[in-house]
Amino acid sequence: MLNNLMTGLALMASAESFIAIFIGLLAGIIIGAIPGLTADIAIILCLPITYSMEPIPAMLLLLGLYCGGTYGGSITAILINTPGTPSSAATVLDGYPLTQQGKPLKALTMALYASFFGGLFSALVLLFAAPSIAHFTQMFGPPEYFCIAVFGLSIIASISNGNIIKGLLGGLIGIFIALLGQDSVSGTLRFTFGVRRLGAGIPLIVTLVGLFAIAELLSRSDYNPRTDATRKQHLKLDHEKLSWAEIKRCLKTMTISSVIGTIVGAIPGTGGGIAAFISYDQAKKTSKYRDHFGHGEIEGVSATESANNATTGSTLIPLTTRGVPGDGCTAILLGAFMLQGMVPGPSMFKEHSDILYGIMIGLVVINILMLIIGRVFTPLYANITRIPYELMSAIIIVYCITGVYSSEASTFQVLLAVIIGAFSFLLRKLGFGVVPIILGVVLGDLVETNFRNSMVMSGNSLSIFVTRPFSLLFLALAVLSIGMFFYKAAKDRKKQKTELD
């Protein structure tokens, strides 16, 4: 192990590697902050460039895009209530309320530190414990994936802002959106309403832009210039910096969320969005300030960002040890490895251990450099909130439409985003929350596909979910999650009643 580390460090420590990391991070952060563009797109665009590069700088360029894109999604989630990437969807829950309170710098700084913490944690786990974790995740099949998704859906209870019925209905709407298009098992079309272009379904990024950005612009149609002037006067950035006491308070949350993110990321087919929601729910249930969650609680930002960035390292675990990509980005990285003459899988640690350890050490460096770059640019991001509302609205519209169009070069996708935005605006007026819908969209396909595959495995017997230890564990966690929600709700009502008496 020590020899591999020293050899990998020597191979990685070159000017070409550091330049590749720096360029990858900067480009990734910018692309991740544009709603509609994701790290997947950035990696695909840069893949041909890496063909003529040495293996380590080539892979570090792509990993810089991956990590930078994951972190960059939090910037727009916090500033304009629109997650730049699907994994940052949960960050809007507390990030944007902090901006509304005149504390964008505090939220952005916490997102940066949490992203660094989670990313570094998972990079170190990848470096020192990849084979052990890979052996553990090999025991997961369709029943386990289904139960993980059910556990994720149980979170709807705690993010429904006191109205669990509307939260559940929102979750069902999200699942319906996820099921539009081609059946992933049989291949038949469903819920397309005669529109052939819906056969491919609605891309997640289109749904995100519609539900958040377009709906937010519509909800501000009663814009008042005086209100905007007052808002700008209250944004005193010099007096809202993140304190050491607040960072210290979030350390426990970041640690637990990083563990959750690392485990979830190591399970193929899950990803940062699921990890972020699970971590947010866990943080809310265990925090002393759980009543502040959803209203601008810094712990909420630390939970979601440390979790989704913790998946960046752990998604590489099944890729490097078994040749199985953990998410969309690592599926592209699989092709990048093969372009460099390396085939990910069990033999990779034997045949290319020096290069592999160089890449893993480089991932640690990527997260450290991301912290440095973020510290330089975060104050500049925060000043975006000072832009006049009329100009900001125009920028957001152009930003989002360009991002959605660029993702698939389709005006139909732009039209879908506008329709979803109008629908989301109507739901907001009726008192529905957006986040339960997003959770349903993220988990809908995972629930359906793995449930049906589990039924095939068991001969249509539901007993498969309670006879396998890990599936039973996640089902128990789902029941416990719902039970804790109702218990704490009853406890809070009793406390309020006592105070009134």
Where are the model-predicted features located?
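Membrane-embedded alpha-helical modules
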Residues: T109-D222, L339-R493
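Membrane-embedded alpha-helical segments of transport systems
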Residues: C67-G72, Y113-V125, I133, I177, ...
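Re-entrant/interfacial helical elements at transmembrane boundaries that shape
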Residues: A39-P48, L62, A77-P97, F128, ...
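A structural-propensity feature for long, helix-poor, extended segments
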Residues: Y66-A77, G84, E297-R322, G326, ...
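Membrane-interface alpha-helices at helix entry/exit sites of multi-pass transporters
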Residues: I56-L60, P97-A114, K288-G300, V324, ...
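Short helix-coil transition sites and intra-membrane helix breaks within transmembrane domains
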Residues: I31-I41, I78-A89, F121-V125, V264-I274, ...
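Transmembrane alpha-helix interface/packing and boundary motifs in multi-pass membrane proteins
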Residues: L25-A39, G68-N81, I156-N161, S258-T270, ...
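Helix-loop-helix hairpins and the membrane-proximal interhelical loops
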Residues: M1-A58, P131, T137-Q138, L189-E297, ...
